[in-house]
Amino acid sequence: IKAKAELQELGYGVSLWSMTSYVELQRDALAVAATNRRKPRAKTQNSKLFHMFGDVTGAVIAVTDYMASLAQGIAAWMPAGFEVLGTDGFGLSESRAALRAHFEVDADAIVRAALANLYRQGLIDEEKLNAANR
């Protein structure tokens, strides 16, 4: 939520989503893909991910306190600009705040990831990237 506020303060539009289960979203997308493969003449079905993110442009940053590979499971069905930040390890810090900073899943890291992503897509210039560089 802090990263959202910081990005909005910099003038960027931000939507915040809470994903309760990356695994279930992946299962849905796989099931829809299998149905479309088995029934090529039928109307193409779309996954829940497509309904949520099919027309999204810009940076889409998935942030999890779990391993990044968990959220990476939905990458094939996400728009360009999808990037995952996760905590691939444990027991390295005395507090959650220190852990999140160590694994770069804190607000500062989210803002940096979003701006770097927008820059790589050519959606912001180097000046805007540097203006918010931390």
Residue ranges and their predicted role:
Residues 1-134:
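Thiamine diphosphate
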